[in-house]
Structures are given as structure tokens and as C-alpha cells.
Design a protein with these regions (language model features):
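Conserved small/polar residues in nucleotide/adenosyl-binding loops
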Residues: 102-104
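Extended low-complexity intrinsically disordered regions
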Residues: 1-63
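An amphipathic alpha-helical micro-motif enriched in hydrophobic residues
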Residues: 46-57, 66-95
Length: 104
């Protein structure tokens, strides 16, 4: 499946768990009009990702409960999925291609 934009993902009928997750992220982008409010600006999105990585790092280094670490990881995953929507990249295919390149 090639990369889809927000509207395509919102209209898409998911056929597996990955597509269901992507649709949920796209619906969040659509609900808050990220595309129309600079939320798809990659400089801004990368800054958010760095901030979330910092929060994950702090949770780990301060010995926070695993639930808090998991929440920060989920934030990062949602952001990465959103990056792929903003850039119209098929993240699942890119993931699979990368794993095949490193022979997994």
C-alpha cells in the first residue's frame, strides 16, 4: 500500500491491525486539522519527537514505572506514524524493507 494522506486514511476501510492504528492516527490529525494548522510541518514535528524522546529518557533514567515508560513510547510511535501520514510515506513497507536489508 503506498503512502496515503490524512483524508485517504480516514476514508480507508482497514483490513488489518496496522491499518486500523494508522486510521486512528489519521483521524486525530483530521480532528485537529493538523494539515491546515502547520501540524504537518516536519521541523515542528521533529521538535515534538525530540521532546518526547526526552520525556522517555527522563522516565527511564528516573526509574519511573514501566507504564509511564510505555506511555512515552506510545507517544513516540504515534508521532512516527503521524510523520508518515504527513509525508505520505508507507511506513509499514519501509519497516519491512529495512528489516529485509538487515536480514531479519
Amino acid at each position: 500500500m503506498e503512502g496515503l494522506n490524512v483524508e485517504d486514511w480516514v476514508a480507508h476501510e482497514p483490513s488489518n491491525e496496522w491499518e486500523t492504528m494508522m486510521k486512528k492516527v489519521a483521524k486525530f490529525h483530521h480532528k485537529h486539522d493538523f494539515a491546515g494548522k502547520n501540524g504537518h510541518d516536519m521541523g515542528y514535528r521533529i521538535a515534538l519527537t525530540v521532546e518526547e524522546l526526552g520525556e522517555l529518557s527522563a522516565a527511564i533514567t528516573k526509574g519511573k514505572p514501566l507504564e509511564e515508560c510505555a506511555e512515552e513510547m506510545a507517544d513516540i510511535m504515534i508521532l512516527l506514524m503521524g510523520h508518515s501520514i504527513a509525508m505520505e510515506i508507507d511506513l509499514k513497507s519501509a519497516f519491512e524493507k529495512k528489516l529485509s536489508l538487515i536480514h531479519i
